[in-house]
């Protein structure tokens, strides 16, 4: 096959959707690219006979005019994750729904994709706020500098509640059990097949770079990864299936306010530490005043929580 013929053939495949195959009265499939080309596939055989909901990244079909994904580079020219990881990872919500031609082929899969995207939005907002907490505490934006800044003390120790929220949000965003609601409806609409092929690629390095300490040795390579895997499998075996309404309530009413509160608290502490460093003679007085106010605020919050828990039937 000559080069002009190959380029014209590829141009025709990238400017129009692939031909449809009617599997049954209610099922449609799509032929793979280059399925009828002897040079690529042999004797005109289909590459894979698996049924496709629609052409997507998972079916190895690139939509027309889809921009390539490029990792950000630092000043030294090396590729490294920065705060733009959040922006790159957030593109899959709207881009996956708008760039995969779902409404043209399967309205039920499109409804399932909307439900899956609605599940991921509140937890992604919480993850963005949690990453802001990390950046406020550590300072630099480069992921390698965030890891190296945790040589002295692991940030998961003082920020343990943030780490727990981060872990649960990752489980919910990647549709892991017990948050596998899109996969639970696979037999009816298969909506989770509409989205997303970026989760496994982008979530894993972001979770590792934001939480793994930078101390060298075997304990920072294998044991922490094994601990995270054991925790994911333990959640799969321990927790049961939960309702979609409870999942959305946890994302919007619990994790989002807590993450906002942590952003405000960490920002206040950082400003207070900078002020104390600028006025070393007032350290003792400000420390006593801060401890007194924190004790009052904490006791008031605990009393109010137990009062609401005791009298919530009257409120409802």
Curated annotation (Swiss-Prot):
Q: What is its main location?
A: mitochondrion
- Reaction(s) catalysed by this chain's protein: a ubiquinone + NADH + 5 H(+)(in) = a ubiquinol + NAD(+) + 4 H(+)(out)
Q: How does it sit in the membrane?
A: Multi-pass membrane protein
The GO terms describing molecular function are: NADH dehydrogenase (ubiquinone) activity
Entry's Gene Ontology cellular component terms: mitochondrial inner membrane
Q: Transmembrane residues, as ranges?
A: 120-140, 153-173, 256-276, 288-308
Where's it found, cell-wise?
A: Mitochondrion inner membrane
Family the UniProt entry places it in: Belongs to the complex I subunit 1 family.
Say what the protein does. Answer: Core subunit of the mitochondrial membrane respiratory chain NADH dehydrogenase (Complex I) that is believed to belong to the minimal assembly required for catalysis. Complex I functions in the transfer of electrons from NADH to the respiratory chain. The immediate electron acceptor for the enzyme is believed to be ubiquinone.
What protein is this chain from? NADH-ubiquinone oxidoreductase chain 1
Name the species this protein comes from.
Citrullus lanatus
């Amino acid at each position: 096959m000559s080069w002009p013929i190959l380029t014209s053939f590829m141009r025709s495949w990238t400017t129009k959707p692939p031909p449809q195959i009617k599997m049954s009265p209610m099922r449609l499939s799509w032929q793979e690219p280059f399925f009828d080309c002897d040079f690529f596939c042999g004797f005109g055989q289909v590459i894979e006979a698996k049924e496709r909901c629609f052409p997507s990244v998972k079916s190895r079909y690139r939509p027309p005019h889809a921009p390539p994904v490029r990792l950000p580079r630092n000043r030294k020219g090396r590729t490294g994750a920065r705060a733009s990881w959040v922006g790159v990872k957030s593109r899959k919500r709207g881009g996956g729904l708008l760039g995969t031609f779902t409404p043209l082929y399967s309205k039920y899969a499109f409804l399932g994709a909307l439900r899956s995207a609605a599940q991921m939005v509140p937890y992604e907002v919480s993850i963005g706020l949690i990453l802001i907490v990390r950046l406020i505490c550590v300072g630099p934006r480069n992921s390698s500098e965030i890891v190296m800044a945790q040589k002295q003390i692991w940030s998961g120790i003082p920020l343990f509640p943030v780490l727990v929220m981060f872990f649960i949000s990752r489980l919910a965003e990647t549709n892991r059990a017990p948050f596998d609601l899109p996969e639970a409806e696979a037999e009816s609409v298969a909506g989770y097949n509409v989205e997303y092929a970026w989760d496994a690629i982008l979530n894993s390095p972001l979770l590792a770079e934001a939480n793994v300490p930078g101390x060298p040795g075997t304990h920072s390579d294998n044991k922490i990864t094994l601990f995270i895997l054991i925790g994911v499998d333990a959640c799969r075996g321990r927790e049961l299936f939960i309702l979609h309404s409870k999942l959305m309530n946890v994302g919007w009413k619990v994790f989002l306010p807590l993450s906002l509160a942590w952003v405000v608290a960490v920002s206040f502490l950082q400003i207070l530490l900078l002020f104390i460093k600028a006025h070393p003679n007032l350290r003792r007085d400000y420390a006593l005043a801060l401890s007194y106010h924190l004790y009052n605020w904490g006791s008031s919050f605990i009393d109010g929580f137990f009062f609401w828990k005791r009298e919530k039937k009257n409120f409802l």
